[in-house]
Regions:
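Aromatic-rich peripheral "rim/lid" segments of glycoside hydrolase catalytic domains that contact
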Residues: 55-59, 63-124
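Extracellular glycoside hydrolase catalytic/binding regions
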Residues: 1-74
Length: 124
C-alpha cells in the first residue's frame, strides 16, 4: 500500500498542485480498483470478460481489502482535492463478487458498494 501511496503523491498530487496554479485541473474517471486488493495482477483491469480468469494468488480477508481501499481512498482524495474537482468512475456492478472468484476485489468499481462497505469516506 505504501508504494501506491507514494506513487499517488509523487505522480498525481504534486503535478496537480503545480498545474492548478495556472489553470483548473479536474481529474476524471478514477476509482479504488487495484491489483493489490484483487490478490493477483489484473494487467491493468483485465477481467473474466476479457478472458482473464486467474485464481487468486493471495486471498485477502474483507478486513485487509477494506484497509487497502480506505488508505488508497484517502491518498487519492488528498491528491484530487489539490485540483478543482474530480469524477469517480461509477460503474454499477451487477455481478456476484462474493461467490464468483473471478470477480474478487472488483467491488471498488462501484461507488455505491464502496460507500456501503465503508471504503470511501462520505461527508455527512
Amino acid at each position: 500500500v505504501e508504494g501506491y501511496k507514494e506513487f499517488i503523491k509523487e505522480h498525481y498530487e504534486k503535478p496537480i498542485r503545480e498545474m492548478e496554479e495556472y489553470f483548473p485541473v479536474i481529474c476524471g474517471e478514477w476509482c479504488l480498483f487495484n491489483s493489490l486488493a484483487c490478490g493477483h495482477d489484473t494487467k491493468g483491469g483485465q477481467s473474466v470478460l476479457n478472458g482473464m480468469e486467474e485464481e487468486d494468488d493471495r486471498v485477502l480477508s474483507d478486513e485487509e481489502r477494506g484497509e487497502i481501499y480506505r488508505e488508497l481512498a484517502r491518498a487519492q482524495l488528498e491528491a484530487w482535492e489539490k485540483g478543482s474537482g474530480y469524477f469517480y468512475w461509477n460503474y454499477k456492478l451487477l455481478t456476484d463478487t462474493v461467490n464468483d472468484s473471478g470477480w474478487a476485489g472488483w467491488d471498488s468499481w462501484d461507488l455505491g458498494r464502496c460507500v456501503d462497505f465503508d471504503w470511501f469516506p462520505v461527508k455527512k
